């Protein structure tokens, strides 16, 4: 389990680095073809309500999200830093790994002091594809009461 946890830690660090560098093509590569990616509030998640800020079902929707960011979205330039801690393996069953970690995203807009943009936890189900671990399901459950600016870059 220690080796798996170390492998997960590396995966989470690589994921955060890809987003911090705005390498959205690399971000797509972290998911299985049949993935689910959601950004959902703690309130909606804990009450079992389906409404999410972002929901992608399948790699096609993940790629569409990237295309929208690149081609149609208009947003203020920003720098983000994704900090991940508390990586835990919750279990392994049938080749699917259940894992979790905490995240904090700091955001620096061009003319403002940095601030915490979002804090929460990742609830993940991962599968091995070849030698790589990939997200079959990534739930980004944020604790914020509200989103201060805009949610452009994936969580």
Label every model-predicted segment.
Residues 33-102:
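A solvent-exposed, acidic/Ser-Thr-rich amphipathic alpha-helical stretch
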Residues 1-33, 40:
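Short, low-complexity N-terminal intrinsically disordered segments enriched in polar/charged residues
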């Amino acid at each position: 389990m220690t080796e798996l946890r170390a492998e997960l830690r590396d995966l989470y660090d690589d994921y955060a680095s890809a987003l911090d560098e705005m390498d959205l093509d690399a971000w797509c590569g972290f998911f299985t073809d049949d993935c689910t990616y959601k950004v959902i509030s703690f309130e909606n998640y804990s009450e079992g309500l389906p409404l999410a800020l972002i929901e992608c079902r399948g790699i096609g929707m993940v790629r569409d999200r990237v295309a929208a960011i690149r081609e149609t979205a208009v947003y203020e330039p920003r720098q983000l830093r994704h900090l991940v801690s508390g990586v835990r393996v919750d279990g392994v069953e049938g080749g699917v790994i259940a894992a979790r970690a905490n995240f904090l995203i700091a955001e620096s807009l061009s003319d403002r002091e940095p601030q915490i943009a979002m804090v929460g936890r990742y609830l993940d189900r991962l599968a091995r594809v070849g030698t790589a671990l990939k997200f079959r399901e990534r739930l980004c459950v944020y604790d914020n009461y509200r989103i201060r600016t805009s949610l452009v870059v994936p969580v």
